[in-house]
Amino acid sequence: MGMEDMADTDQARMGGERRRLDALVIGAGFGGMYALHRARGMGLDVLAIEAGDDVGGTWYWNRYPGARCDVMSIDYSYSFSDEIQQEWTWSEQFAAQPEIFAYARFVADTLDLKRDIHFGTRATAIEYDDDACLWRITTDRGDLFEATYCLMATGPLSVPKQVDIPGADRFGGELYLSGKWPHHPVAFAGKRVAVIGTGSSGIQIVPVVAEQAAHLHVFQRTPSFTLPMRNRPLDPDFVGHIKRHYPGLRAVARHSLTGGVRPISSRPLFSVSPEERERLMEEAWQHSGLAFLGLFSDLLTNAEANEVVADFVRGKIAEVVDDPDTARRLTPRGYPIFARRPCLDTQYYESFNRENVTLMDCLEDPIVEITEHGIRTREREVQVDMIIAAIGYDALTGAMLSIDIKGKGGRSLKQKWADGGRSYLGLVMEGFPNLFIIAGPNGPSALANFILLNEQNVDWICDCIEHMRANGLRAVQALPDAEDRWMRKVTELGGRSLYPTANTWYTGANVPGKPRVFPVYIGGLGRYREICSDAAAQGYEGLEFE
């Protein structure tokens, strides 16, 4: 492109671009990046738009102290390119945010993706033209794109909940959201800091801030089960072994339950003696909490088996935390272990043995308001210089519902999803032709390795588009009865497990007014792949083409 052409493009962007495309990808996280790469490889005229100023999705936004992936780095990476697998070398078993973000940028540079991404651009409305069989997408920069296919790579954890505590706007100190952490350094030294929330983000933030702050107050409503991460540098010989055997390891991972290479046992908990159970759990605790998920086959279907493991972890909390009352308050009860996304921590419980850390139990003494100088509970006011809100996300459906999406006949997505997210295979919806979802609700989403799931979703979607183009088909949507059958399957499978019994972001219980449903397919990534492949092999069974 010459300078004159670039100037014309810049001018168009300033006034809002008008462009007709084959495909528009919304989001440039790991799902959107791969979707852009695949679509370009098919010869489509494709563009991606991204609200952030760089690639990486959740790893662009989540820069909070201690941010780290709880999936092993050798698994949490693309498998479609052996060149990328061989050139990139992970430094730790569980990679931190800066390294994952650097990896995303490395992939984007290797594949030259950024030339087809508009950064700093957020979709505000997406409307289907029934007659023209295309989508019209408007953005917050005044752009208007028309696309035959719209690929939603908005991510399941990309809309942080906002602080809705009265008085937040009058706080005189620093206030940060973990999910929208600033890009400039934040200093904790010498400051009184409050962390609100003890889910995955809060559990990672607390140990880092505790080491630096003058005093840290941790405001906890519901205690979380968290297991030791036991992170460590990756040995070069081990990395070399993995790289040599990546093809076989990836094949196993793609057809596994979660998309990883760790072993999953087929033995029920009560099939082994109490002594053997104790030995296995102690080994898992000392090696890495991640190993707990594969110890026994019935931890999420048998409440009694689940309680055995939960009691073991409760005992560990009592061992680690010196003060018995603090240990009691940190101990989760009333919901099954692993029914909420399991957390892996680095010295989380140990942080509460520090003299500069105070646990605030919001069940016993709830937060009433934020004041100019701190946080007022029912019984006291805690004065702080900084508040960090680690209060979670409007997960799975929040990102798509934040856009004004209207399908056939002007029907809105908000109407369709009024009772919770629904789709066919988590990929296609009735009433929204040529709108494809990547890692959204109704697939394995939160229970699988997101990157391998993204690859599978994108491959299936792009294969479907190729099928349409080869056969002169203009539009595709899910058949109503196929969507109904899939949702029944998702609901019935979930109902056989312990997942729906806990108040979690899986079910939407963390967002006031959100429908309480469990929309995630729990049959595993491998079985999900088979179902999707079978549907494609049957001429895309469950879909209606025109």
Enumerate the language-model features and the residues they cover.
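Ligand/cofactor pocket segment of small-molecule handling proteins
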Residues: 206
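N-terminal FAD-binding dinucleotide-binding subdomain shared by FAD-dependent oxidases/monooxygenases
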Residues: 2-23, 28, 33-168, 173, ...
